[in-house]
A protein has these predicted regions:
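Glycine-rich ThDP/TPP pyrophosphate-binding loop and its adjacent helix/strand module
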Residues: 1-135, 142
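Thiamine diphosphate
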Residues: 2, 25-26, 153-306
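A generic structural-conservation signal
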Residues: 9, 41, 120-121, 149-150, ...
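Flexible loop/turn segments at secondary-structure boundaries
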Residues: 16-19, 48-49, 76-80, 147-148, ...
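A broad detector of short, well-ordered amphipathic alpha-helices
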Residues: 52-55, 138, 218, 244
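A glycine-rich phosphate-binding loop feature that marks nucleotide/adenosyl-phosphate handling sites
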Residues: 71-78, 126-129, 150-160, 293-296
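Short coil/loop linkers at secondary-structure junctions
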Residues: 117-118, 146, 230
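Outer-membrane beta-barrel domain signature, strongest for Gram-negative TonB-dependent receptors
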Residues: 133, 137-139, 143-155
Length: 306
């Protein structure tokens, strides 16, 4: 669609997914020759190389305003998770070889070889950081637990109750004269979306067929011409991508209005809504929020689709 997309995707490729190994060269073959996606790669164990290649990738994205893929070949240390017994499916030699590529050790090696630090200074810095981390862990472990429904719900409560209340009251007092021509529900929603796009320059509306076609029921017809292609645009037929874009736009200070075309497609994005959108405010203790308005068609022509 020609819309600038300055996006840098970073793949930390440790070559294994829990116990299943990635086919040799699969990442490079899959992403190395994609149209409109510039590919960069570096050895994740070599911090100097990572810095150089990362700078090149970032410069490309900023200069061309196009996406790039940064492939970092890394290692996985100490298994997939606390319950993962790595020696059950990997040999001791493989595990030991990974520790030889630990980027932390690689950084220490560079510091010593370039004369920036002595071995003793590196070890002292490491032990000092260990002390700091253990002290922080002790402090966190002693924090009060969430022991009541009120404590659990507090991070989810509206952070600006007064502003929300004032907006709700203003809407209830709005001029509701009905002496004009009757409109359909679709036309009323279209007007509301048009007013939102006009009054809020940070608002974006996107989804399947919402721009050029104007939605499968015509609800978004004409909005792309009003707000422009950068604010009202069609997406891939992928609900996870639609909601993922909305989540990212929300925390960037924008007002995303993603559309799920039919209710039957909602389950494709259930994890983004339940596992990300609905919990971000809780897990960040209200430091981050997801101010998105998810639109799903209702009163559709076919039972089960809206």
């Amino acid at each position: 669609q020609g819309v600038p997309m300055p996006l840098l995707l970073v793949c930390e490729d440790n070559g294994i997914g829990i116990s299943v190994r990635t086919p040799q060269g699969w990442i490079a073959r899959t992403y190395g020759n994609r149209a409109d996606l510039e590919y960069f790669t570096a050895d994740g164990a070599d911090v100097a190389e990572v810095l150089t290649v990362s700078q090149r990738a970032a410069d490309y994205v900023r200069t061309h305003r196009r996406p790039a893929f940064l492939h970092l070949r890394t290692v996985r240390l100490m298994g997939h998770a606390g319950s993962d017994y790595e020696p059950g499916y990997r040999s001791g030699d493989e595990i030991t070889a990974d520790y030889g590529r630990d980027p932390l050790l690689g950084t220490a090696r560079i510091l010593v070889e370039t004369g920036i630090c002595t071995v003793a200074e590196v070890l002292d810095a490491y032990e000092a950081k260990r002390t700091d981390v253990l002290a922080l862990a002790t402090d966190v472990a002693e924090l009060p637990q969430l022991d009541s429904p009120h404590a659990v719900m507090t991070p989810l409560r509206e952070a600006r109750d007064d502003a929300v209340r004032a907006t709700r009251e203003a809407a209830s007092r709005a001029d509701r004269r009905d002496d004009g021509p009757a409109v359909t529900v679709a036309q009323a929603i279209n007007r509301a979306l048009r007013e939102t796009l006009t009054d809020h320059p940070e608002a974006l509306l996107f989804g399947e067929d919402v721009a050029r076609k104007g939605g499968v029921y015509g609800v978004t017809r004409g909005l792309a011409a009003t707000a422009g292609a950068a604010r009202v645009f069609d997406t891939l037929l992928d609900e996870q991508s639609i909601l993922g874009l909305a989540l990212g736009a929300g925390v960037c200070g924008l007002l995303p209005i993603p559309e799920i075309q039919y209710l039957a497609y909602l389950h494709n994005a259930a994890d983004q809504i339940r596992g990300e959108g609905a919990t971000l405010q809780f897990f960040s203790n209200r430091q981050y929020r997801n101010p998105m308005v998810v639109r799903i068609a209702g009163y559709g022509y076919q039972k089960g689709f809206g």
